[in-house]
Amino acid sequence: MDHEDVTRRAVEKKNKLASSLIHAPFAICGLCWAFVYQKLIYKQTYTDTHARNYKVPARFQLPDPLLTQILNHLPTEEAVKTSVLSTRWRTLWLWVHNLELSFSKFSSFNAFLSFGNWFFDSDRVSCIESLKLSLDGNDASYLKPWIDAFVKRKIQRLHVRLTQGCEMPLSLYRLVSSCPVLEELKIDVVWMDGRVYRVHSRSLKSFILTDLESDAKFDISLRFHKWVFNEAKTSTIHMFLAWISRVRDMTICAQTFKLIHHYSESVQLPQFGYMSSLYITLNASDLKWFPIFLRSIPNLKSLILVMERTGSSHQLSPKAIKRVSISSVPECLLSSLEFVEFKAPICGLAPEMMLVWYFLENSPTLKKLTLRLKSHSTKDDFVKKLLKIPRCSTECEVIFL
């Protein structure tokens, strides 16, 4: 066999190995076995003497992008260990796209900080596809340059684990809102201490909170550019609503309520059996769907309402009022609702009066109805209107603010 045939066979073996490494799952412990295979290719092609005395030609070596892809399958600490294999491998791990960084893996917080500063150096241009970051209760100001690096390297998936006493750093919230390609955000809530998690993003496709207590408060605002519900979008909303169905306190904006209404036209809403408190903003045109939504909250105790003041809600015609009239009475009004509050000042418009009438006439458990009047409204005139409404509850107190 001449030298040309040997070379051809070696290159074929290298390409075959490269293909198998890309498409086949594998587990690696300790030293990266791809490095060993790289040496074996040459050893199998030439005699042992040649292998010992001849430097491996570049054409027999696996390319750096493939080696980096291999390192992406390793735990970060194992990928770092490959830096001792040779001079060539010394910095390869710095180009991995998937990273797991936990302060508990380091001997001290300073060691953790030093490593992060080194890896997230602003001059490095490699992309970060996925990052799992475990934080402790130290001052989080050190995260700012790291966050800048995340945005610069177009991070797509972020998993944050917060230990007891550690609050979500404000810089991470800025990352969510400023990173144009972030698609997945997961937060492990190890310890609930009344913390608030606010997420605002145009690119986020997945937001996961784990180990969250059922009495956590949810404030959700979801918007879609088009009210077109294909199978994928319907499935996503279904999973989201099912996931939050155990919360006890929820805030919903008008757009989110409209979204839920459109969803409920084709799929039955889940039961929010644990929810006792609801803060909701409504548009007058959506009032007729409100009782349908309340049917899914059978144990609601406290309700705070905000009516959106749009041109259409100010000028509802008698026919429009009839179309949005509310007839059905959900279970919560009959058995659990005790407190209703109109958060925005009311001035006697048809949608507002219709809701006031609805709660007073249909809820035997209602204890307090709180109303705010606009300055030009007189209390006496409004009281006269209220007196004409039959009350289902003999204990209901109407409060004017």
From Swiss-Prot:
It comes from the Eukaryota. SMART domains: FBD. SUPFAM superfamilies: F-box domain. Residues 56-102 form the F-box domain. Transmembrane segments: none annotated. LRR repeats lie at residues 128-152, 275-296. CDD domains: F-box_AtFBL13-like. Residues 321-373 form the FBD domain. This is Putative F-box/FBD/LRR-repeat protein At3g23955.
